[in-house]
Amino acid sequence: MAQQEAEILRPLANFSPSLWGDQFIKNDSDAKVRYIFHYVDYTNLSMLTATGTKMVDTMNLIDTLERLGVSYHFEHEIEEILQQFFNLNTDYNDEAYDLYTVATHFRLFRQHGHRITCDIFGRWRDENGKFHEGLKDDAKGLLSLYEASYLRTRGETILDEALDFTTASLKSIAPNLESPLRRQVEHALVQQLHWGNPRIEARNFISLYEEYEDKDESLLRFAKLDYNLLQMMHKEELHEVSRWWKELDLVAKLPYARDRVVECFFWAMGVYHEPQYSRARVMLTKTIAMTSIIDDTYDAYGTIEELDIFTEAIERWNVEEMKRLPEYIKPFYKALLELYEQFEEELAKEGRSYATHYAIESLKELVRSYHVEAKWFIQGYLPPFEEYLKNALITCTYCYHTTTSLLGVESAVREDFEWLSKKPKMLVAGLLICRVIDDIATYEVEKDRGQIATGIESYMRDNGATKEEAITKFFEIANDAWKDINEECMRPSPHSRDVLMRILNLERIIDVTYKGNEDGYTQPEKVLKPHIIALFVDPIQI
């Protein structure tokens, strides 16, 4: 067999090994951590509901709770308060409200789906429609407006202009600011709050908040304790999936594929970090890890004949298909079917076994698109951009991962899965962002491997564009898609915030993973390694 393999020309990618080895198979966290959350309390919660507390003070507290990553403890109270405040129809043209306050309130309302108008920023523009130059002296106001502008939707030109103005202004004044404001501005310019992973942002803000002169010491301690408790829970789950991965032994059986189960868990944690989603995180991690194997089989190993057979086997979804498969992929196919059998048994207990049907159908669609992509590569075919994009929106895996992210979410019902299967506007926006950002980050590596059927190459040929022009266009596509996501998160919606937030959070993980045009999943050393250490290795000192 070795001689036969040597005669087969395979498109090997020679991926780097896992950074983590067996590090997370060893688990030293407290197994009772799940129960500690019942006893965690914050004594100053009364500030949220205290009679006579000013709206501005309450909104600032909500903002602080969210930035510190502890707002999930008070989710219902915060939703009720924001609804009450929104119903007040506050006149933000009143001079009593400064830019910092107005922009913060705007962002909080939009983050929670309330359709507040962007016209409230009009009073900070001159007769020519330009933002007042004097605002450059208001660093906090600029930062707040900068963060608010990322909640914009299509047609909100005032927020487009606000983003340009605040970005340039903050870059100009940042070197002259004092910390912690300087650190906060510098971080915001690299990682936008609305696009960031909530846990990463929480860890960063905890260190900033510690430097605030007016910090609430008890709230700070609570945030640190909560962060460490959640970290312990996440480490337990990472231990579970690492052990599962080790027992499958796919790293040894399929050495051509990326060994990234830790990075897969990082993605799942980004979709939902709260304690009640523990099962969902484990299930999603497993589906991402298995998809990664499939991706690499099509992209970096299988011959067209082997992939023809494997595609048919996935389509038929029957253990009997193993007889036809190449030897190397049989253990994986068996493990994949068994995984979904376990999911179905688990979900049947709560009357949700139908969810696995939608996940499997989405996986079949993904594999069909991988197959098309593989044939393009092998045939040296560069499709027109429209043809490329139609297929590539599926191979970015966002559609499949969005579907599987709801498997372990008890509140996700049949109507939610049916909605996703029809590719709604919000999902398509997510697909676009994932696709073009991935294409930008992986272009040079794929080009070096001889891949010509890439989005950048296709767009360049169809439009007579340079690489730089194509990349600029792809970023424009992503920015417009973010506007669509913001619009679809507005109330009213037939779908719960619980479901919508999974789509949004998965998009945030894309932004973090491909930060700086790097493929942080394939090469995690630079981009993801520091985050993984902060989230799953190093606790915060209390």
UniProtKB/Swiss-Prot annotation:
GO terms for biological process: diterpenoid biosynthetic process; green leaf volatile biosynthetic process; sesquiterpene biosynthetic process. Mg(2+) 2 binds at D295, D299. Gene3D superfamilies: Farnesyl Diphosphate Synthase, Terpene synthase, N-terminal domain. One of its GO terms (molecular function) is magnesium ion binding. It catalyses: (2E,6E)-farnesyl diphosphate = germacrene A + diphosphate; (2E,6E)-farnesyl diphosphate = (1S,2S,4R)-beta-elemene + diphosphate. It is found in: Plastid, Chloroplast. Expressed at low levels in leaves. Mg(2+) 1 binds at D295, D299. Its cofactor is Mg(2+); Mn(2+). Transmembrane segments: none annotated. Its EC number is 4.2.3.-. The keyword Chloroplast applies. Mg(2+) 3 binds at D438, E446. A motif (DDXXD motif) lies at residues 295-299. Pathway: Secondary metabolite biosynthesis; terpenoid biosynthesis. Binds 3 Mg(2+) or Mn(2+) ions per subunit. Belongs to the terpene synthase family. Tpsa subfamily. Sesquiterpene synthase involved in the biosynthesis of volatile compounds widely used in aromatherapy and folk medicine, and present in culinary herbs. Mediates the conversion of (2E,6E)-farnesyl diphosphate (FPP) into germacrene A and beta-elemene. Not able to use (2E)-geranyl diphosphate (GPP) as substrate. This is Germacrene A synthase. The gene is GEAS.
